[in-house]
Amino acid sequence: MTNIRKTHPLMKIINNAFVDLPTPSNISSWWNFGSLLGLCLITQILTGLFLAMHYTPDTTTAFSSVTHICRDVNYGWVIRYLHANGASMFFICLYAHVGRGLYYGSYVFQETWNIGVILLFTVMATAFVGYVLPWGQMSFWGATVITNLMSAIPYIGTTLVEWVWGGFSVDKATLTRFFAFHFILPFIILALAMVHLLFLHETGSNNPLGIPSDMDKIPFHPYYTIKDILGALLLISALLTLTLFAPDLLGDPDNYTPANPLSTPAHIKPEWYFLFAYAILRSIPNKLGGVMALLLSILVLMLIPMLHTSKQRSMMFRPFSQFLFWVLVADLLTLTWIGGQPVEHPYMTLGQLASTLYFLLILVLMPLTSLIENKLLKW
């Protein structure tokens, strides 16, 4: 008798994706982040659902409803901080996942990669609208500053901004629609993640060597399920430690002050995971130029498959490319630090240098280095 998991229409799909999936035998822990992102998404949807049961998307009561969740709802503070810090964990896993793809040449699977970039954009949009919901000072001013960037679009900019706001400033209508977006987007992310997996399973996973592994595959279960469970336990431990010992470590104290349109905070800055893009935005003195650079900082990822000039897929045996990759990581960390600093002399210049280096590395230096490495292979 054939096993039900191989014949049942629904079970068959799950079986082919998570049980009998042929997987390369040599994939490292860097391949854990895909499943960790799935775990993060489920955690965020569940905690978010419980928060939505008590939250009111109205300018007069939003802030106090969040306070009510923390003070009066049973374990509401745990749910709220799991959700807030879960977002940080989500982005740590996202950036590690993208970094893994860059290092090992996973971007050669173009459909999977491009859907991944769209997913990154969608998660960033979700995090942004979600940050507005507590209606603190940084929520309000962050929403004002970022939505205002659309006014840089020639001719239709101002109309577009007012259309997004639902009025002439960030107000009741803006908060209500942002709550609606924040509720619907995670389900769109869930659907996109399934398409991401669908395309990945068409080709099979890449591996650290960047070579075909069809002759050496092992079933996903039990080998990688157990490995993923270890990763999941580490992620949950980190999230719980952060939530229970330092829940406000990554947040902004300004968001504990209710939104006040008449008082601008001294330093408007987004959450830590957007600081690198914020630094790139600020490094260009022109408004439209800044917006273009901001978009390109993520969109440039879509160009990477076309900029792959190496004869080898992975960076494992390409020391010069490895060096540039780690320079890129250091550059992004520098941009993250600068994004959180005030707009003053040394930081502005450093930000401009780091932003230039970011685009230079991806668009020029890395493809050129790959060509040089190709030549060195012949020597």
Curated annotation (Swiss-Prot):
Localization, UniProt: Mitochondrion inner membrane
Chain sites annotated for binding a ubiquinone: 201
Topology within the bilayer: Multi-pass membrane protein
GO CC aspect terms: mitochondrial inner membrane; respiratory chain complex III
GO terms for biological process, alphabetical: mitochondrial electron transport, ubiquinol to cytochrome c
Major subcellular location class: mitochondrion
Ranges annotated as spanning the membrane: 33-53, 77-98, 113-133, 178-198, 226-246, 288-308, 320-340, 347-367
Residues bound to heme b b566: 97, 196
Alphabetically ordered keywords of this record: Electron transport, Heme, Iron, Membrane, Metal-binding, Mitochondrion, Mitochondrion inner membrane, Respiratory chain, Transmembrane, Transmembrane helix, Transport, Ubiquinone
Keyword Transmembrane helix assigned: yes
Gene Ontology terms, MF aspect: metal ion binding; ubiquinol-cytochrome-c reductase activity
Top-level lineage group: Eukaryota
Listed InterPro entries: Cyt_b/b6_C, Cyt_b/b6_C_sf, Cyt_b/b6_N, Cytb/b6-like_sf, Cytochrome_b, Cytochrome_b_C_euk/bac, Cytochrome_b_N_euk/bac, Di-haem_cyt_TM
Listed Pfam families: Cytochrom_B_C, Cytochrome_B
Residues the entry annotates as binding heme b b562: 83, 182
Entry similarity comment: Belongs to the cytochrome b family.
Miscellaneous field: Heme 1 (or BL or b562) is low-potential and absorbs at about 562 nm, and heme 2 (or BH or b566) is high-potential and absorbs at about 566 nm.
PANTHER family xrefs: CYTOCHROME B
Subunit structure: The cytochrome bc1 complex contains 11 subunits: 3 respiratory subunits (MT-CYB, CYC1 and UQCRFS1), 2 core proteins (UQCRC1 and UQCRC2) and 6 low-molecular weight proteins (UQCRH/QCR6, UQCRB/QCR7, UQCRQ/QCR8, UQCR10/QCR9, UQCR11/QCR10 and a cleavage product of UQCRFS1). This cytochrome bc1 complex then forms a dimer.
Role of this protein: Component of the ubiquinol-cytochrome c reductase complex (complex III or cytochrome b-c1 complex) that is part of the mitochondrial respiratory chain. The b-c1 complex mediates electron transfer from ubiquinol to cytochrome c. Contributes to the generation of a proton gradient across the mitochondrial membrane that is then used for ATP synthesis.
Name of the protein in question: Cytochrome b
